[in-house]
Amino acid sequence: MKIRNSLKSLKDRHRDNRVIRRRGRVYVINKTQKRFKARQG
């Protein structure tokens, strides 16, 4: 999982990327290509 300051550019890298809030953290998840997982930090 990558840790980035800004997830906006990561979200646009693949069409299946979703921005999700879990436990106060912001994540990008992708069900089809797991390598696009990222967390804002």
Curated annotation (Swiss-Prot):
Name of one Pfam family that matches: Ribosomal_L36
GO annotation, biological process: translation
InterPro entries per UniProt: Ribosomal_bL36, Ribosomal_bL36_sp, Ribosomal_L36_bact
UniProt GO MF annotations: structural constituent of ribosome
Any single GO CC term annotated in Swiss-Prot or TrEMBL for this entry: ribonucleoprotein complex
Signal peptide feature range: none
Ribosomal protein among keywords: yes
Entry keyword annotation includes Ribosomal protein: yes
Family: Belongs to the bacterial ribosomal protein bL36 family.
Listed name of the protein: Large ribosomal subunit protein bL36
Species of provenance: Novosphingobium aromaticivorans (strain ATCC 700278 / DSM 12444 / CCUG 56034 / CIP 105152 / NBRC 16084 / F199)
Gene assigned in the entry: rpmJ
